[in-house]
């Protein structure tokens, strides 16, 4: 009975596979929005203000960071919790493939969240006259919470490995 239960629990990890595959659709949706933003800005490129252009570029950078985060979680999560990816060495194999454990994935996700939060905060500062000071204060507090959390996770990871 114990053996059957353990085998069933181990096999249950495959329930994560469609979830990780679903992240590929999320990446596709993000790519569509990215190019929608590009096609939206191109006709206005010569008449748009510098500040609006910078805000648009920050949005594009934000989407690129989220896309990288999706790929990292999708591939590393699959490899860590479902099965190893069998990618031929001759193909464009990602350097970190097979080397990122759940701890390093957690740190990379935290760093990505801090970077994404930084871009959102920068966008807020670009339009600071239009934003309520209390709302801006909460954005800063939330961002600092992300920064402190990422730092704490990195520190905890460092002291537990030594």
Curated annotation (Swiss-Prot):
Cellular compartments annotated: Cell membrane
Superkingdom per UniProt: Bacteria
NCBIfam families (UniProt xref): HI0507
Segments passing through the bilayer: 15-35, 53-73, 136-156
InterPro entries: UPF0114, UPF0114_bac
Name used for this protein in its record: UPF0114 protein PST_0950
Principal location class: membrane
UniProt key word Transmembrane helix: yes
Cellular-component GO terms for this entry: plasma membrane
A Pfam family recorded for this sequence: UPF0114
HAMAP family, A to Z: UPF0114 (MF_00143)
Recorded family membership: Belongs to the UPF0114 family.
Bilayer topology: Multi-pass membrane protein
Keyword terms: Cell membrane, Membrane, Transmembrane, Transmembrane helix
